[in-house]
Amino acid sequence: MAHAEEPEDRTASTEPVVRPGSLLVSSTDLVEPAFRRTVIYVIEHNEAGSLGVVINRPSETAVHDVLPQWAPLTARPSALYVGGPVKRDAALCLATLRTGAQADGVRGLRRVHGRVVMVDLDSDPEVVAPLVEGVRIFAGYSGWTYGQLDSELQRDDWIVISALASDVLAPARVDVWAQVLRRQPLPLALLATHPIDVERN
């Protein structure tokens, strides 16, 4: 069965539910350089902990230089993205399925949520290519032990928003942090106007 784009969750809850397919949008008070104005796509969230990748931090390393076989499938910019501070020497890959494409039973693809799938980088790109709109490859990931993310949510470090499949492949020229906030209802949407450099404002 094909998975269409899920309807967007346009509600902000004081007790947000994190699940695979959620976005963790850093709050304006989170000034730690590694996560300031970041958007994290949640891949796993269970009793063992949580795992996700930052989807708006392209690096200067070209995919062609490290995984040339995947470069033709990589959405622009064809750069390796910095997925987070954990295991920066390891690569994770997400892809967005084409509308109507079937991933069930395809070796190397694992559904995360809706049209977003994880791709095993040891699989055959020629098998994957007809099924996906593009892939995004990340160096490292962001991880939390059990209860750690809940503590950060209680501190209001993160805003939980449901992702659209298109968020995963957003081009570098798009301010993803502002874009996902702007599409939320007021007053949350107003945060999108928060200046990048507060000291300049």
Swiss-Prot record:
- What Pfam family is a match for this entry? DUF179
What the entry lists under InterPro entries is as follows:
AlgH-like
Kindly list the GO CC terms recorded for this protein: cytosol
Recorded hits in Gene3D superfamilies, A to Z, give:
VC0467-like
Family to which this protein belongs: Belongs to the UPF0301 (AlgH) family.
Q: What is this protein called?
A: UPF0301 protein ROP_34500
